[in-house]
Amino acid sequence: MLLLLLLLPMCWAVEVRRPRGVSLTNHHFYDESKPFTCLDGSASIPFDQVNDDYCDCKDGSDEPGTAACPNGSFHCTNTGYKALYISSRWVNDGVCDCCDGTDEYNSGIVCENTCKEKGRKERETLQQMAEVTREGFRLKKILIEDWKKAREEKQKKLIELQAGKKSLEDQVEVLRTLKEEAEKPEEAAKDQHRRLWEEQQAISKEQRERELAASAFQELDDDMDGAVSVAELQTHPELDTDGDGALSEGEAQTLLGGDAQMDAAFFYDRVWAAIRDKYRSEVLPTEYPPSPPAPDVMEPKEEQPPMPSPPTEEEDEDEEDEETEEDEDEEDEDSQGEQPKDAPPPAPAPQTASPTEEDRMPPYDEQTQAFINAAQEARNKFEEAERSLKDMEESIRNLEQEISFDFGPNGEFAYLYSQCYELTTNEYVYRLCPFKLVSQKPKLGGSPTSLGTWGSWAGPDHDKFSAMKYEQGTGCWQGPNRSTTVRLLCGKETVVTSTTEPSRCEYLMELMTPAACPEPPPEYPVEGDHDEL
């Protein structure tokens, strides 16, 4: 259309007599047979005062062809190019402002008429733009047809998935029931296996405790009369109960339940549990009789002298606030080393049996393992079906979203939905994924920064689909969240052409796409080369 408008003046323009600097559209105001009325109506003057180099009208309309009025306008006819208004102050200023040179009629300089050359270049540009529009619109129609077909296919696929979903849901429920049925004997067999193992552990532990108690009884029974007396018990001051470092006769008698002595059976039942953790053997632990192999059986702990009560949490916090970590470590070591004045030297650290295979639960028997394998197979089938159902539900959601999305009046922008486009500048790589997000990352590497996620179409009311808005990107330091407006321009290819930041944290991106090409106007043939000017 612009090309036609440019060509029409060349074909049909006729010379109309008018004062210098007056346009064809205003020539009827300048009738030399009548007085001239200022265009703003401020005054009327004789016509011979028009262009007399003296400003009579407030709006400068009486001096369109001179520089007398600072607010006047001079019209450049520019035949062969585009007409132009310039300020009257530029008339005869020694600078060629009109391509036809008519503004310098009395300045003494000669202006070359460049209008035809400019018109030729302008027409070439307009022709190229028209070609881009025609080709882009042709591609746009293909995109529209492609989306119609793709949309129909997606709708069919959606119907198939929705039908398949019901079948898969039923399958999942069947497999869930089979899994639960298979897990019942599995759990029962595993519980029985664990219970038998724990019972064996308890028996082994009881046996070991009796052996330890018997060994301690033999050590305490100095006269080997088959009983432990108060005096024999007093030979072990570590059994002190009042913290004075010695086991008094009364304390020993209390430990023996008020009796003067006690045989081995009563010693295990009544005394051993009370002294077990304090008692220190008089022989090395290696001289104990070896324990029978049993799971989860540990060597008895050797007795240690009484330790001071550990500090409370509040005391610990106070110490942390007042002292350094190194001081606390030293205090802990000191507190562990404190002993009553009359206490015997500290005993070696208690030794425990090293972990062995017997300490671990034994492998499942063949029948239990068979139950486990069957249940695991049922679980695997159920989980696989459940994953398939979740994948199908995700596919259904994606299809529903894509089918219902607003891709333009005829779906011409749908092809952008699954694409991303990049623009590399000196500092950043900008990435646009239409209908999803915009981001930037440093060219030399680094994490991407979100410039916004899809918000809405953002063009004016008469051209809604000419711009996109992406919002709620990464927040700027002490500023708003980043956002991006994407202007859609007509082009034969889809490419990001520019990215700028006109306002802080607000970006402007331009995307060329055939989908933005308008329908070109019909082409009217131009008959011959009738340039009457």
Curated annotation (Swiss-Prot):
BP GO terms, sorted: liver development; N-glycan processing
Positions where N6-succinyllysine occurs in the chain: 165
SUPFAM superfamilies per record: LDL receptor-like module, Mannose 6-phosphate receptor domain
Binding-site residues for Ca(2+) 2, renumbered to this chain: 93, 95, 97, 103-104
Binding site for Ca(2+) 1: 49, 52, 54, 56, 62-63
UniProt region (Disordered), positions on chain: 284-363
Keywords on record: Calcium, Disulfide bond, Endoplasmic reticulum, Glycoprotein, Hydrolase, Metal-binding, Phosphoprotein, Repeat, Signal
Pathway involvement of the protein, from the record: Glycan metabolism; N-glycan metabolism
Domain (MRH) ranges: 418-519
GO CC annotations, alphabetized: glucosidase II complex; intracellular membrane-bounded organelle
Record PTM Phosphoserine, positions in chain: 23, 88, 167, 388, 395, 439
KW Metal-binding (keyword) present: yes
Domain EF-hand: from-to ranges: 208-243, 244-279
Signal peptide per UniProt: 1-13
LDL-receptor class A domain residues: 36-70, 71-112
Tissues showing expression: Ubiquitous. Highly expressed in liver, spleen, lung, duodenum, stomach, adrenal gland, pituitary, testis, corpus luteum, uterus and fetal ovary.
Residues of this chain annotated as glycosylated in UniProt: 71, 481
Compositional bias of kind Acidic residues: 312-336
Entry annotated with the keyword Glycoprotein: yes
Subcellular location: Endoplasmic reticulum
Subunit structure: Heterodimer of a catalytic alpha subunit (GANAB) and a beta subunit (PRKCSH). Binds glycosylated PTPRC.
Role according to the record: Regulatory subunit of glucosidase II that cleaves sequentially the 2 innermost alpha-1,3-linked glucose residues from the Glc(2)Man(9)GlcNAc(2) oligosaccharide precursor of immature glycoproteins. Required for efficient PKD1/Polycystin-1 biogenesis and trafficking to the plasma membrane of the primary cilia.
Name assigned to this protein: Glucosidase 2 subunit beta
